[in-house]
Amino acid sequence: MKIYKADFITSGVNPEHYPEPLLPEVALAGRSNVGKSSFINKLVQRKALARTSSKPGKTQTLNFFNINDEVMFVDVPGYGYAKVSKTEREAWGKMMEKYFTTREILKGVVLLVDIRHEPSADDVIMYDFLKYYDLSVIVVATKLDKIKRGQRDKQIAAIKRKLQFDGQDTFIPFSSETGEGVDAAWEAIYRHL
């Protein structure tokens, strides 16, 4: 896919902060440091459109990115970071729940999980939440380059089993280092628009 435009538009906490609903939206969710920003940057062929950090919990708002005037990516705060206060975690949870349940132009959610590990309890809760609200889900297993080729099928099966993966959803192994999975991710995203 040729990317001719990839712009950060705004950050928001409440609906009044969201941009006008002019483009279909695809949200990106996952644990802190699972690679959401790296995923965005690899898809749009930029090094720093979405800021990456080695420190978990950096994203604290909904961040909206206009891609080619065709789709809006919405990077949501990572979950599961223990050093964030309970009050802050609850506020993030309410912010994300409000977005996921009220944003009519939300066409799907990319749920990123680390292929090296079984999904956490938080990953399972997020997947179940998205399915409960009948949202289309693309599960992207990041950090594919960090495991041996012979381990891939085993890890994919373990992730699908733990999530109780719905066969109607899409599953994509992905590496922001090698670019493996980029084309499959774009195809899945465009199927949901």
UniProtKB/Swiss-Prot annotation:
UniProt: Mg(2+) binding residues: S37, T59
Binding-site positions, GTP: 30-37, 57-61, 75-78, 142-145, 174-176
Stored SUPFAM superfamilies: P-loop containing nucleoside triphosphate hydrolases (SSF52540)
GO molecular-function terms, A-Z: GTP binding; metal ion binding
Sorted UniProt keywords: Cell cycle, Cell division, GTP-binding, Magnesium, Metal-binding, Nucleotide-binding, Septation
Keyword hit for Membrane: no
Pfam families tied to this protein: MMR_HSR1 (PF01926)
InterPro entries tied to this protein: G_ENGB_dom, GTP-bd, GTP-bd_ribosome_bio_YsxC, P-loop_NTPase, Small_GTP-bd
GO cellular component terms given for this protein: cytosol
Cofactor: Mg(2+)
GO biological process, alphabetically ordered: division septum assembly
Keyword Protein biosynthesis listed: no
Residues spanning the signal sequence: none
Record-annotated EngB-type G domain positions: 22-193
Family of this protein: Belongs to the TRAFAC class TrmE-Era-EngA-EngB-Septin-like GTPase superfamily. EngB GTPase family.
Function as written in the Swiss-Prot or TrEMBL entry: Necessary for normal cell division and for the maintenance of normal septation.
Name under which the protein is recorded: Probable GTP-binding protein EngB
Organism the protein comes from: Exiguobacterium sibiricum (strain DSM 17290 / CCUG 55495 / CIP 109462 / JCM 13490 / 255-15)
Gene name as annotated: engB
